[in-house]
Amino acid sequence: MFIKFLHKIFSNRNDRILKKFKKIVSSINQLEEKFKKLSDKKLQENTGIFRLRLKKGECLDDLLPESFATVREASRRVFNMRHFDVQILGGIVLNKQCIAEMRTGEGKTLTSTLPAYLNALTGRGVHIVTMNDYLAERDAKNNTPLFEFLGLTVGLNLPEMSFIDKKKAYLCDITYGTNNEYGFDYLRDNMIFSAEERVQRELNYALIDEVDSILIDEARTPLIISGPSEDSSFLYKEINKLVPSLICQKKEDSDKFHGNGHFSIDEKSKQIYLTERGLVEVEKILLDRKLMKKEESLYSSNNIILMHHVISALRAHNLFTRNIDYLVKDNNIIIVDEHTGRTMPGRRWSDGLHQAIEAKENVTVRNENQTLASITFQNYFRLYKKIAGMTGTAATESFEFSSIYNLDTVIIPPNKPMIRKDLSDLVYMTEEEKINAILKDIKNCIKKNQPVLVGTISIEKSEMISKKLKILNIKHNVLNAKFHAREAEIIAQAGKPKSVTIATNMAGRGTDIVLGGSLESQLEKNMYLDKIETIKRNWKKQHDLVVLSGGLHIIGTERHESRRIDNQLRGRSGRQGDSGSSRFYLSMEDSLMRIFASDKIISMMRKLGLSLNEAIEHPWVTKAIENAQKKVENRNFDIRKQLLEYDDVCNEQRRVIYAQRNKLIDSENIQQNIYDILKDVLHSIIKTHLNFDFPKNTRNILDLENKLSIEFNLNISIKDWLKKDHDIKKENIIKKIIDIAKKNYLNKEIQIGFHNIRMIEKSIMLKTLDSLWKEHLSAMDYLRQGIHLRGYAQKDPKQEYKRESFNMFSNMLELLKYEVISFLSKLDISYIKSNLHLNMNNNSSIVNNDIKMGRNTPCFCKSGKKYKYCHGSL
C-alpha cells in the first residue's frame, strides 16, 4: 500500500513536469517545417548564431527550442533518423539537470545529442560518461558525423592515450570517456608538476549514461591512485597457512564473540570476527611460527598489523569466491565487477585484501600500495557545474539521487506502449528443483522458436547452467567476464529464433537485443548488393517468427540485491513495443533469501510440505522477497551515505590542497609566498622558545640558537645581543632574526639566479606538499579504520573523525611551512650551480595508478620518462 501511495505521488509529480516540458516539445515541433527548408549551409550556420547570442547575454533555455530543432533536422539529414517527441522530452529533462528514466531501446544515445549540442555551445566542454571503453568508442564514432556537420569537435578519452592526446580530447566541444578515466584524469591533474601536463579544463557539464550504475552501484568504491609500499608478501603467505586450521562458528550461535568456533561471519556486512577461542588459537599458532613474541598479545600495539593480516586472510577464504568475485588469470587476481559481471584488469582491493587472495590462490603476492590520491564518484561528479543522467531504471533510487546529488528523476513515457508480460515468481525449496524448472522453461521456448535470455548473478552460476544445457545438447552462448571480447556479437544475435543466451548481470551492456537478430551486423559481413535483399528478406522472416512465438523471454535465475538490477534484466525484453515475457525463478537456498529472509518465512515454507519440483506462489513469500531486497537496498544506501559523510571531511581538505597545488603550478613567481612563510615559521619558533621566563631562561635561548643553526642554517648568538642590550624586547629579537634570514636567502637568490631560485622554490614546495599529503592520506585511512571504537567511550565516531582529521590537517599545513623553509635555508649553492643544466622536474614525484609499475617502466603520468626518474623518485 505504501509503495502504491508513493508511486501515486511520484506519478502525479512526474505528470506535472512532463506536462510543462511537453509545451516546449510543441514549440520545437512548430519549428520543424521551417528548419527542413533550410539549406545545409544555413542549418550549419545556426551554431555560430547560437554562440553569438550566448555572448550577448541569452541563456541556454532561450536557445533550447531552436537548438533542439537544429539537431533534429541535422540528424534526419546525416543519419536519416528523426528524434521522436519522447526523445526531445528526454533531451529537455537532461538539460534541466535531471535524470531521465528511458526504457531500453528508446534511443538514449540519440537523445543525448540534444543536450550535448546545446551545452557545447558555451565553449566550456561537455563530458559524456559511459560505463566502458567500448561504449565510449562506439558512441563517439556513431555521433561524430552529426556533431561535425554542426561544426562541433568530438574527442575520445581512453586509458592508453598520452597526456598530449588526452589534452586534445578535453579541448574538444564534446568528449566521450568512462567514469573511471575522467576521475583518474582529475586525480592525475592534481599530481602534475607543470601546467602543460594538465589535461582537463573546467568541469562544466557531465552527461552520464547508465547513471544509476555509476552514481549508485559504483559509489561505494573510491578511485585510488597509489604507489608501492613496503614488501610484506612473506607475512601474507605465512598467515594464509594458518587459515585451514581455524573453524567457522555455526550460524545458530548468536554470540559472535563467545561461540564454539574460532571466528564468526557476518554475511550482511561482509565482515569476520575472531571469537575468544579463535584469539587464543591464532596467538598459539603465531607463537609456534615465531611471528609473535611470548609476552605479547594479538591486540597489543606491536601486533596490530598481524591482526590485520589474520582478518584479511579469513575474509579472503570465507567471503570471496573464485569465478564469482574474481578470476585467476596469468598469475594475477582479476576483480569481477559485482554489478556488471565485467572484469576490471589493473584494479586491486585495498587494505591487504588483494594480497590475501593472492596468497590464497598461490599466485605471486604483490606489494601493498599506499594511497597517494583518491576520490569517490559521488564527490567527483559533484565538482561539475551541471550534471544529468540517463538510465532505464532510476525511479526506485529517486530519493538517493535527490538527497545526495540534488537530481530530480523524471520518467519518460515510451514511444510505443510496453506489452511485455512480467510473469509472477516461482519459488522452490532447493536450488536443484529451481534449475530443473529453468531447464524445462528453456526447452519449451525452443520448441516454439522463442529466444531466451537467462540472467545469472555470477560466472559460477552461468557456467553451471551452461554445463546442464550441454548435457541436454542445447546450443547456447555464454556471456560473462571470461568472454568479454565476444560480448557485442553475442548480444546482437540474442534475439534470433531458438537462441539461448546466458548472461552474467546484464546491467550496462549497452547493446539492444533486436528480435530476429541484428540486421546491421549481418549486412556488415555481406556487402554484396545481390545478397543484401536476400539477407533482409531472411531477417524479416526470422523477426516475424520470433514475434509470433512471444518475443524475447527473460529468465532470472535468482533475485538480485536490488530491484533495480532485476528491472534492468527485464528491460532487455519488450523494447520499442516489441512482444516479450519475463519470469524469475527462486529457491530458499538463494543467497538473498538465505541471508536476509526471516527465519519464520523459511520455517513456514518447510511446514507446507511441498512435493518434489513443486513451486509456490504465496503472498507471504512474495512479500518476504520484497522485504529482503528492501533490507539490502536500505543497507547499501546507508553504506553509501556513510562513505560520503566520511569522504566529505577528506573532500574539503582535498579541495584546499588541490587549489593550493594548482595555484602553485600556475604561478611563475612565489617569492612573496616564501617570504610570508619564512616570517610565520620563524615567528612561531622564536616565540615558543622565548615565551617562558625570558631572558633569564638561558636554556631556552641555547635551544633556540641550536634549532636555528641546524634547521635553518642561521648562526646567531642571542646571548651576545643580550649582553649588548639588556633591555632588548622579544619582538625586536624576532624582527632581527627574520631580517637576517631574509638577507641570507636574498644572497642565495643572487648567487643562484632569480629564475633558477623560483624554479627551485616551486619544485620544493610541490614535492613537500605531495609528500605530506600522501602521509596525511595514510594517517586518515588508519584513523577511519579505528574510529568506530570511540563509540564504546560514548563518543560520536563521525564527530571524533571530523575533529581529529581537522587537527591532523592543521598540523600538516604547519609542517609544510616548516619543511619548505628548512629545506630552502639549507640549499647547497655550489651543488645547485654545478647542476643547473639538469631538468628540475626529473625529481618530480608522483606515483602509479592502481596498476603496479616497475621502476623502469614508462611513468604513470604519461610524460615519457621512466617511473624511477619521474613520479617514483619521492
Swiss-Prot record:
Enzyme kind, highest EC tier: translocase
An example GO CC term for this entry is: plasma membrane
Major location category of this protein: membrane
- Its Enzyme Commission number? 7.4.2.8
List the keywords (alphabetical). ATP-binding, Cell inner membrane, Cell membrane, Cytoplasm, Membrane, Metal-binding, Nucleotide-binding, Protein transport, Translocase, Translocation, Transport, Zinc
Which cofactor does this sequence's record say it needs?
A: Zn(2+)
Q: Where does Zn(2+) bind?
A: 859, 861, 870-871
- GO BP annotations listed: intracellular protein transmembrane transport; protein import; protein targeting; protein transport by the Sec complex
What interactions and quaternary structure are annotated?
Answer: Monomer and homodimer. Part of the essential Sec protein translocation apparatus which comprises SecA, SecYEG and auxiliary proteins SecDF-YajC and YidC.
Q: Which family does it belong to?
A: Belongs to the SecA family.
Protein's name according to its UniProt entry: Protein translocase subunit SecA
Classification lineage: Bacteria, Pseudomonadati, Pseudomonadota, Gammaproteobacteria, Enterobacterales
